[in-house]
């Protein structure tokens, strides 16, 4: 059997901090970040800008029809290169670069080339999804409402 002991180890204090048995060595420099590419260098950037203008013009109508927040993660060679959010749930609608400010209802992870084919109408979204060309997480059924937004924009 184990015997309870009241033995407390004694540590001889030396110069320097000994709190919690670690020593703060100083700040670690941040790793150098690669220089970010300009947004305009991406093939899909003009399309996003155009859709953004369209949403600003007819956003209030789209908010009534769609009522969802979508996040588009555009990839190239398996890495996310662009992230855009289409907010058709709040206010009169908005589209902005970056992650969703509020939790997104649906998140799309799409290679840039597939995204371009989808928005230009060269590829059927349902067939592309079923073929595994892009991934959807969250409320998958809302993705069909985004298809309506892209078709609306194409007519514009």
UniProtKB/Swiss-Prot annotation:
Residue ranges constituting the SCP2 domain according to the UniProt record: 44-156
Protein name as annotated: SCP2 sterol-binding domain-containing protein 1
Annotated GO CC locations: cytosol
InterPro entries to which the protein is assigned, alphabetical: SCP2_sterol-bd_dom, SCP2_sterol-bd_dom_sf
Pfam families for this protein: SCP2
Gene from which the chain derives: SCP2D1
Coiled coil residues, start to end: none
Native source species: Homo sapiens
């Amino acid at each position: 059997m184990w015997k309870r002991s009241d033995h407390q180890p004694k540590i001889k204090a030396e110069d320097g901090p000994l709190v919690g048995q670690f020593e703060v060595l100083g700040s670690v420099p941040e790793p150098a970040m690669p220089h970010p590419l300009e947004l305009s260098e991406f093939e899909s950037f003009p399309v996003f800008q155009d859709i953004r203008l369209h949403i600003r013009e007819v956003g209030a109508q789209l908010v009534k029809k769609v009522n969802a927040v979508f996040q588009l993660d555009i990839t190239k060679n398996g890495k996310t290169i662009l992230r855009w959010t289409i907010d058709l749930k709040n206010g009169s609608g908005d589209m902005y670069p970056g992650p969703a400010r509020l939790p997104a209802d649906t998140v799309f992870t799409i290679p840039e080339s597939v995204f371009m084919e989808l928005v230009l109408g060269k590829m059927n979204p349902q067939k592309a999804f079923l073929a595994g060309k892009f991934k959807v997480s969250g409320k998958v059924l809302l993705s069909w409402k985004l298809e309506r937004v892209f078709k609306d924009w194409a007519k514009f």
